[in-house]
Amino acid sequence: MAQNFTKLNPQFENIIFEHDDNQMVLNFGPQHPSSHGQLRLILELEGERIIKATPEIGYLHRGCEKLGENMTYNEYMPTTDRLDYTSSASNNYAYAHAVETLLNLEIPRRAQVIRTILLELNRMISHIFFISVHALDVGAMSVFLYAFKTREHGLDLMEDYCGARLTHNAIRIGGVPLDLPPNWLEGLKKFLGEMRECKKLIQGLLDKNRIWRMRLENVGVVTPKMAQSWGMSGIMLRGTGIAYDIRKEEPYELYRELDFDVPVGNYGDSYDRYCLYMLEIDESIRIIEQLIPMYAKTDTPIMAQNPHYISAPKEDIMTQNYALMQHFVLVAQGMRPPIGEVYAPTESPKGELGFFIHSEGESYPHRLKIRAPSFYHIGSLGDILVGQYLADAVTVIGSTNAVFGEVDR
């Protein structure tokens, strides 16, 4: 029986629609396991079809941008770990890259090699984590177990380098805190071989799996126009056939010297995005294999040399009075960049991650803005989910690879 316009209170205070017996409103999350703890979707259904989807975010909001405006530039670095916590070194680097651009610092080549290795290692760890969790959401439990075993060995490498497994804090403004430990590169080579084997195993389990393909093919289709209008980036954009990768378009660190491809999709569906994550693991392995021989050819400095912004090496601080005073000022008061503003984009595992910094010449930013890819991808669910079956909502949400640490900030 048809009913009049109905206003539902209090949980659905903003939803007004004329419904019949085939229509209903479903509150998806934030408790649902596939909403990853922080996403609420208000879904309007007609039968099994979604006719409207309203994402609601903010459950993990911590005021990260305002925190950055009340800390010195170096103090803020550990906070960036808590954005995309599945690839925290990428967040560290994106922030450091923006500050270094503002300061016009020249980074030593050895530090660039180490940074690029860490970025690509983090990319592989993030990608294999996505594939495992996405497969688990769809129902492939065994893939989750195999992938997590390999991911653990990647995290062991990060722990050997910086002492932390998840929130690495592995980058510094001006370089890196540590040189690579002895035999670390040998462990990295072993991990690359293990990652190749894990990738082959996952492809054997999924690529020709009829259920997996039925759940992903033609589900969550994104068109090039939709991707551009929503400001999508990364694999969400490249899945539509647009070959845009900031490592190619605006190269940073050593990417200009490296030989790698940018895989693109054809259909823009969830299966295309899964395939691109698998292909990008191959490209990261290819990049690291080019970087390993570069490391031995570099000199030892791992931090930029600029007494106005960067502390002297520890041996100088312990033996030279001027270096000690300079270090005291930088720690107690913080560096003071010139007046100006900068936006520096980077290609994180999720897409375009950039920091906008406006400086008034003080020891903390006047304005700090984070451009996080997951924020735009979650917003696009309002378009992508319309017309999909309710059972496919989990697949579509998972295929965006959104992490809510950088959605809510």
Curated annotation (Swiss-Prot):
Record key words, sorted: Cell inner membrane, Cell membrane, Membrane, NAD, Quinone, Translocase, Transport, Ubiquinone
Function per UniProt: NDH-1 shuttles electrons from NADH, via FMN and iron-sulfur (Fe-S) centers, to quinones in the respiratory chain. The immediate electron acceptor for the enzyme in this species is believed to be ubiquinone. Couples the redox reaction to proton translocation (for every two electrons transferred, four hydrogen ions are translocated across the cytoplasmic membrane), and thus conserves the redox energy in a proton gradient.
Protein name, entry field: NADH-quinone oxidoreductase subunit D
Matches recorded under Pfam families: Complex1_49kDa (PF00346)
SUPFAM superfamilies found in the cross-reference section: HydB/Nqo4-like
Stretches of the chain forming a coiled coil according to its record: none
Oligomeric form and interacting partners: NDH-1 is composed of 14 different subunits. Subunits NuoB, C, D, E, F, and G constitute the peripheral sector of the complex.
E.C. numbers: 7.1.1.-
Membrane topology classification: Peripheral membrane protein
